[in-house]
């Protein structure tokens, strides 16, 4: 069982990797779908971007963000399977877990506006307050998935869980959020350098890296929440 090991930064990352190794199909298939959809319209628009193309890009980006929230809540379901000792998750099992996660996605999406977008703006303006907010609210998605709270209550509950464990959450769940986005952009740059294509090359590089990093980020968040919830009971 995952809770047998005391919570620490290294143990959380190690357990997140263990879940991915145990369920590679369940971890990677949804991530590949999300990773490939991410910024595809942006990278494939050539020349000057007009208003219609900007709208399409914005809508697709919003849809990709919606899919990311699905993946984070889905990761919570898969973590539960690992906690129960399930040996493998089939393709049908993946679809089942996605269906299980989908009802809480709208609530999680609303909470994410505060939990992710506001800290990003704050980081742009002033680094420390943004990282502080990002860490305090980093556990909102698993809180909504498992405790069935509304957006505001989930943010408050996340802050309660983080209290006294700020460094642990900062170096796991908060770092995972930053790592996922930074790695995706780095992959796009690498794709451009390797292929010399600012369309399909950047898209391919970003998609591959996002597909690999996203599961680690999501499961690290889920495992961190699980440990802190157990310790608070």
Kindly give the residue locations of the regions a language model identified:
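Hydrophobic alpha-helical membrane segments
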Residues: 1-233
